[in-house]
């Protein structure tokens, strides 16, 4: 059964980004539980914050699961990327992600590689950069396997990376890895920019998709843009997808309203797909 999740950012430097709740982890968990979400997806400043803020205790208190943990603070706060041409910068990037893979894994959740993948160029050709990316994903995927969870790799739109922009691009990168424990994060906002047919792209990536960001075409809550969710939900059902639809969206018009609109859209979409 497909499950619902909502995002929480704890990174001040990411202010203005597409996260529903901000800063107050306990308040966000409480609101998520009251609205009926199954889980939360957390964007922490570092791995230590998950323990310092007692995320495990909050999940137990509010009867929530942890859908995933983002690693993007490594880029937003420290300008680290896994494909930096300078090895002295690549190693701290990998260590930063490793710490989150471990912290998330202990809580039964995967870590996400999105902005930390970086870009190729600036004196580094695509083959070299792709080697660095594949090497990092392989190592991190094997690390995640020790906790019984996958690593999630997110194709991004062309304005954010030049590695994988479509699910097909992402699948090609997965085929280069020395592990089968890396799955794709299908972000419906990025897909609305890059895919010719989002539903078809999802079906073609059957078996590779491990997580979905539930967002409309304008990065607002589903129902606030022009994405037709019906064929996408049928595609996910056809794939046998039973993971999370996680709202990585702007808090429009405010966090509480965005969360409420998201859970309403989630229920409507899953009900329609089941009929």
Placement of each model-derived feature along the sequence:
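Active-site-proximal loop/turn and secondary-structure-junction residues that shape catalytic pockets
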Residues: 10-12, 44-46, 72-73, 117-119, ...
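Active-site acidic/histidine proton-transfer and metal-coordination neighborhood
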Residues: 22-24, 61, 80-183
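Generic structural signal for well-ordered alpha-helices
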Residues: 25-30, 52-56, 97-101, 134-141, ...
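Structural motif
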Residues: 35, 106-107, 207, 239
